[in-house]
């Protein structure tokens, strides 16, 4: 069996290869990047639907925030939304209540695009008033305005390695118990002109 690590696994699994796509470290890199730009007050946009407290993207975010000594209140994590409209309303409400929020970290790029839309409707300038960062480097990240800073996972390499590992397991060949990849930060306009590099 081949498992992709998107949540914490606390047990030893037989005949299983774990694939670390870089989700955890990529999330930490998001926070480090925003912190270098002076951001200290974050909102975290979790995926739609039922939240998972063992999600390693969230764990990476929380671990890095803690390591940097940044205070992150539980109410600044928006999760459990059933649809985009609900998420949009919660984000707007939180931004209205707390004018010191200067960054939004989204679980994936579509949610980051929602944050850009909310900021625009509220008259906030991105990145001057609010930095926004996504995850996945989806096609939408290049077509929103401003262009979205995001994190790219090596999807083709991950898929190829997972398939090779699965075939090795089927053939009972020797195979590593864990395969790790590094995610890449793609810096665009949504997180500050001073660190902007074209991708």
Regions found by a protein language model. Give the residues of each.
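Hydrophobic beta-strand scaffold residues
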Residues: 1-3, 72, 126
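Conserved beta-strand scaffold positions in the cores of enzyme catalytic domains, especially
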Residues: 2, 16-18, 44, 75-77, ...
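An alpha-beta-alpha
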Residues: 28-70, 75, 178-191
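Flexible loop/turn connectors
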Residues: 92-198
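Short beta->alpha junction loops
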Residues: 75-85
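Flexible loop/hinge segments that line or gate small-molecule binding clefts
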Residues: 1-26, 110, 136-148
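Hydrophobic alpha-helical segments within soluble ligand-binding/sensing domains
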Residues: 17-44, 59, 84-92, 112, ...
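Short beta-strand/turn micro-motifs composed of small residues
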Residues: 4-6, 20, 46, 79, ...
């Amino acid at each position: 069996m081949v498992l992709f690590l998107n949540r914490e696994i606390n047990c030893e699994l037989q005949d299983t290869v774990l694939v670390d796509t870089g989700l955890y470290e990529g999330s930490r890199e998001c926070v480090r990047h925003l912190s270098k730009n002076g951001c200290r007050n974050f909102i975290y946009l979790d995926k739609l639907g039922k939240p998972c407290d063992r999600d390693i993207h969230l764990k990476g975010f929380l671990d890095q925030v803690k390591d940097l000594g940044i205070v992150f209140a539980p109410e600044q994590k928006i999760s459990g939304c059933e649809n985009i409209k609900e998420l949009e309303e919660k984000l707007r409400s939180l931004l209205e209540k707390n004018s010191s929020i200067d960054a939004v970290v989204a679980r994936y790029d579509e949610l980051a695009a929602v944050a850009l839309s909310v900021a625009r409707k509220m008259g906030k300038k991105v990145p001057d008033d609010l930095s926004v960062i996504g995850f996945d480097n989806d096609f939408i990240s290049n077509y929103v305005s401003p262009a979205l800073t995001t994190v790219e996972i090596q999807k083709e390499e991950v898929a190829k390695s997972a398939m090779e590992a699965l075939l090795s397991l089927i053939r009972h060949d020797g195979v590593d118990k864990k395969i790790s990849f590094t995610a890449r930060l793609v810096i665009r306009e949504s997180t500050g002109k001073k660190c902007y590099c074209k991708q």
